[in-house]
């Protein structure tokens, strides 16, 4: 199995690659973790990971700048139904639009917009930086065996914007930061996380292992 982590100039690429290699090794999964900017290698991969940090518009421009990458993603994820994971802004790009400073079109895979977080508690600072628990809204194999909820493990977040999904069924999990904030989305063969599994220690490694084993 070959897992393509897309290098388009954004994301914690080294830590993501290392986390996927470690999760595969510790779970006894035979997987080649391929950090690549080659659209053809993405198109032929068994699983695809789209990381991302920074501004939505910058990440979209970076993705568009890689020849054939958006086309490869649409073909491989939507038509060939290969398992896909978006991380942080990589998840946000799954949406229809980003509303950060300007309106930027996303990939349009998950109905909804990415908008600025406005916590109900004014003492909560933006961006949300640090550890927070996640609460699963819809059961999904990606969370199998992972303690969640009030007594669960913590995930690591760094973000100022959130995906406001139009369909509640697409929201797999939330976190509480002055109100519910989308922590994970999923539909068909695609999932995305606002938190960083590559930085989320035990929860993150278990999550990555579940993604590698997932058969949508």
Swiss-Prot record:
GO molecular function per UniProt: glutaminase activity; imidazoleglycerol-phosphate synthase activity; lyase activity
EC numbers, comma separated: 4.3.2.10, 3.5.1.2
Gene3D superfamilies: 3.40.50.880
Keywords: Amino-acid biosynthesis, Cytoplasm, Glutamine amidotransferase, Histidine biosynthesis, Hydrolase, Lyase
Summary of the function given for this chain in its UniProt record: IGPS catalyzes the conversion of PRFAR and glutamine to IGP, AICAR and glutamate. The HisH subunit catalyzes the hydrolysis of glutamine to glutamate and ammonia as part of the synthesis of IGP and AICAR. The resulting ammonia molecule is channeled to the active site of HisF.
Record note on quaternary structure: Heterodimer of HisH and HisF.
Name of the protein in its database record: Imidazole glycerol phosphate synthase subunit HisH
Organism: Brucella melitensis biotype 1 (strain ATCC 23456 / CCUG 17765 / NCTC 10094 / 16M)
């Amino acid at each position: 199995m070959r897992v393509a982590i897309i290098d388009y100039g954004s994301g914690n690429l080294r830590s993501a690659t290392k986390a996927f290699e470690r999760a595969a090794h510790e779970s006894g999964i035979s997987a080649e973790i391929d950090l690549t900017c080659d659209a053809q290698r993405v198109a032929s991969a068994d699983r695809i990971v789209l990381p991302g940090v920074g501004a939505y518009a910058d990440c979209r421009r970076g993705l568009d700048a890689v020849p054939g990458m958006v086309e490869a993603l649409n073909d491989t994820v939507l038509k060939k139904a290969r398992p896909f994971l978006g991380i942080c802004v990589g998840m946000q790009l799954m949406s229809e639009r980003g509303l950060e400073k300007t309106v930027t079109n996303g990939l349009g895979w998950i109905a909804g917009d990415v908008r600025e977080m406005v916590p109900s508690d004014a003492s909560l600072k933006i961006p949300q930086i640090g550890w927070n628990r996640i609460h699963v809204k819809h059961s999904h194999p990606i969370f199998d065996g992972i303690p969640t909820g009030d007594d669960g493990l913590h995930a690591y977040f760094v973000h100022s914007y959130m995906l406001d999904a139009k369909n509640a069924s697409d929201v797999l999990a939330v976190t509480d930061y002055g109100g519910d904030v989308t922590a994970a989305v999923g539909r068909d063969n695609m999932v995305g996380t606002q938190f960083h599994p590559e930085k989320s220690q035990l929860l993150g490694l278990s999550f990555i292992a579940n993604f590698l084993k997932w058969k949508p």
